[in-house]
Amino acid sequence: MLQPGGGIELANFAFRGEAIPVCRSVLYFEQWQTASGQRRAHGYSGPQAIERYLEAEDKGRLIQSLKSHLSQRALTGTEIFGRRHRLEELITRIVSDLRKRAEEQFGRPVVRATVGRPVRFVGAESEEEDEFAVSRLREAFLDAGFEEVNFELEPVAAAYAYEATLDRDELILIGDFGGGTSDFSLLRVGPEVRRRGRKPEDLLGNTGVGLAGDAFDARIVRKLVSPALGSNSEARSLNKILPAVPAWIYAHLEHWHYLSFLRTNNVREILKSAKIRALEPEKIEALIAIVEGDLGYQLHQSVQKAKYELSKRERTEFTFRDGIAGISSIELRIPVARIDFESWITEDLATIEHSVDVLLRSSGVKPHDVDRVFLTGGTSFVPAVRRLFTKRFGPERIQGGDEFTSVAQGLALSSAAAAGKK
């Protein structure tokens, strides 16, 4: 939030007894039966959605990654407890709650928004699809009560935050690593640029790819966790030895919010049969415990913890332990080395590196022309990601800071610049 005096204040959100400056774009819907027998449903967003989901014994419907579907015309919405909800309507619910929280904290109406957007939305294969995604996002914000909605590229917003620390002009490369996208911008920033006013030619170029932290997490699940749950296990079927469990079940494990879709009678029968026939039944039993306990969120918290620890040291141990009433408890302890993790994400790293290559070539800029590389977002902590940039630009030119909030701060500064307040 841009304050009247020009300062920036971040909204805080309650989560498990703490106040945090970030809000995940998730929704959780639960249903219950009234005394009269009627079915009622209620929805929650952000940290409260995660809290309600974790506390619920009978899990409702958890929805996330909505922005990743904005460019897809075929995906108009989803059905929740028998009612059809448009995609824009679901995003409006999140944005409305954000706006309400901001008004409560800052004590004044919030009617203008500068919204961050990726360079290229996930799944967008043309400018038309990209603009379609923007139009849907704009509709959601307007329906949430905002009277004026402007958009800024997320890496450009991060550049605004970095620029506030400068005492001279620089040509900078911004790398913004989110959950679903990695975005890059090349632009000139600094005090003189602010004084003379920004020009279109100050932004030399943008590129983006639809992968980042979530893709890295999925690799850890596929290569480390799923084998411990039987993905490579075999089973006897008549005179044949076949995979114990269909591969598509493990694909659902790679995205924690998909795991709840496995809690069906069909999957239960598949897993029950697999456990009986499997050569490693204990692994299938562990998989059953995770599916029946709907432990996808907890599992991925352990995955992210292991990824974080591998950013700090060469080796760690992936640990996951949970006990579910009426179901066998599960405990996984798997050693993992950074070198293994880096081998799993080799193709992803190559895609990111290629995106930076394209940006430099299309902008006519050589690596030695770049004064500074500013990396933001949680995935920027991954050593293999940072090496892509230190190898090309030198460690002395790599900088980070406020990795989880720099885009939000930059959006406020972008709004101020657009309004002529600076």
Specify the residue positions occupied by each region the protein language model found:
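Phosphate-binding loop and its immediate beta->loop->alpha context
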Residues: 6-138, 142, 224-308, 312
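Short beta-strand scaffold segments in enzyme catalytic cores
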Residues: 1-3, 25-28, 183-187
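Helical "lid/coupling" subdomains associated with nucleotide-phosphate turnover
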Residues: 194, 218-234, 254-422
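N-terminal phosphate-binding loop and flanking beta/alpha elements of the actin-like ATPase fold
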Residues: 1-19, 49-174, 188-210, 215, ...
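Short glycine/serine/threonine-rich phosphate/pyrophosphate-binding segments
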Residues: 180-185, 408
